[in-house]
Amino acid sequence: DPLDGTKEFVHRRGDFTVNIALVEKGIPTRGVVYAPAKSRMFFTQADGQSVEEIGDFAKDQLGETKAISVSNPDNSALMVVASKSHRDQATDDYIGKYGVRDMTSAGSSLKFCLVATGEADLYPRLGRTMEWDTAAGHAVLNGAKKISPTLTLSPMHRALI
């Protein structure tokens, strides 16, 4: 997805991303999520581990990286990240079932990356979504050792992260 978070981009909010993914047999195996306005880039390495590039970005060489990992959440005090543009009553009702310590909004596939880094514990997405919007973030999340919830959906169509 060359521009995920179009509304955020148009309204000059920094939560848009550029996404690149490799999907093999329906499974997102490699992903890159770049948030240029936030100077953050996350990607899955060849060994499957996800990292965040930190420091100055150089177009000709990879900068310093750090491994990322999901949090070990306290289910009675979750940090929730939800969509700015696609939040609805069903999402609010779902969030209401959990003990929420704090909640933040973010746009684009950046939400996947906030869960992948442990900055958030839960990203509920109950509405329709497209593969090109989720594949890169899903791969980054998988590489951060996130175990996706068991749902009766294919790996590319999980509703809850």
Annotate each predicted stretch with a short phrase.
Residues 9-10, 104, 134-135:
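Short glycine/threonine-rich catalytic loop with a Thr-x-Gly-x-Asp
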Residues 19-113, 154-161:
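Acidic beta-strand-loop-alpha-helix segment within the catalytic core
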Residues 1, 32, 124:
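Short aromatic-hydrophobic micro-motifs that form the base-stacking/packing surface
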Residues 2, 82, 126:
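Short glycine-centered, acidic/aromatic-flanked micro-motifs in structured strand/loop junctions
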Residues 71, 92-97, 111-161:
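Oxyanion/phosphate-interacting regions
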Residues 1-24:
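Flexible, acidic active-site loops/lids enriched in D/E/S/T/G that coordinate Mg2+ and/or position polar
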Residues 4-5, 86, 129:
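Short glycine-rich anion-binding loops that position phosphate/pyrophosphate groups of nucleotides
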